[in-house]
Amino acid sequence: MLIYSENQRRLAKIIAEDATRSNWTDWKWHVRNSIKSIEGVERLLGIEFTEKERQALRNTTEKFPMAITPYYLSLIDPGDYRNDPVFMQAFPSTDELRIENHDMSDPLHEDEDSPVPGLTHRYPDRVLLHVSNTCAMYCRHCTRKRKVGDRDSIPSRDDLRQGIEYIRNTPQVRDVLLSGGDPFLLSDEMLDWLLTE
């Protein structure tokens, strides 16, 4: 696949008229220009939902936010988008709001294995430290979708210090997995602080 195909160039120009190939290859440009609205997807893919569909999809994104990077959007086939696997992974579905008897808000039981907020300690020698709740793209199948994108639960340094102290005081822990969201969306300074602590 080309690094900057004709379709990608076209999308980049719709997003930002002055977009260049160097923008397209810059991950920060993609994060800044993530598509977060139903109307944005319609405009960029040249598709159209009915007003009823649009409203139902908005109801879904109110509970589970949407973010699709321009790159992922460029992989979607607008001619057959409803059957496109990338579209289904990235685009909200009204089925996400349907709760079945067997559905759980915490399917991995991370909260049960959480001795302090933001840390999961399920196995004796390793912990999972939740350092971010943001991703470049919000996958619709995410097992943490109840937290991802929630601006009210972005971990602060004080929140993270509780987890760090727990790790320091638990000598059997030898592996610490940084998780989220995507930890690599944190600033270099924040990652440096986490790894130093």
PLM features per residue range, with description:
Residues 134-138:
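Short pre-active-site segment immediately N-terminal to redox-active cysteine/selenocysteine motifs
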Residues 91, 104-130, 140-197:
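Conserved Radical SAM active-site core
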Residues 1-121:
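Flexible, acidic/Gly-rich N-terminal and inter-domain linker regions that tether
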